[in-house]
Amino acid sequence: MAEPMISIEVAYAAVDRQALIRVQVPQGSTLRAALQASAIGQQFPELDLAACPVGIFGKQVSDPEQHVIQAGDRIEVYRPLLADPKEVRRLRAAKAAEARKRES
């Protein structure tokens, strides 16, 4: 008898395009196995699926090799930030302060 299948989604957003892939995987699959089954790496060859951080519904999963997914889960593949948010805020505040100084 065949294993029961569950439906999940895999999401990834690159700078220039995004993908949301629906895939059927065997019940009891790990997050990493579901990523491989989705073939997201073929659409985005720049992804290192073994090293990139992943999560489910916005919550990062620390051990994707052991985490068992559930029916309806949305697996999200995260990419690194291009700029440090603290540094961006600091630069924006400095620029605003400089603009206020020139206006006075």
From Swiss-Prot:
Instruction: Name which cysteines form disulfide bonds.
Output: none
HAMAP family xref list: UPF0125_RnfH
Tell me its family: Belongs to the UPF0125 (RnfH) family.
Protein's name according to its UniProt entry: Protein RnfH
In the UniProt record, what gene is named as encoding this protein? Answer: rnfH
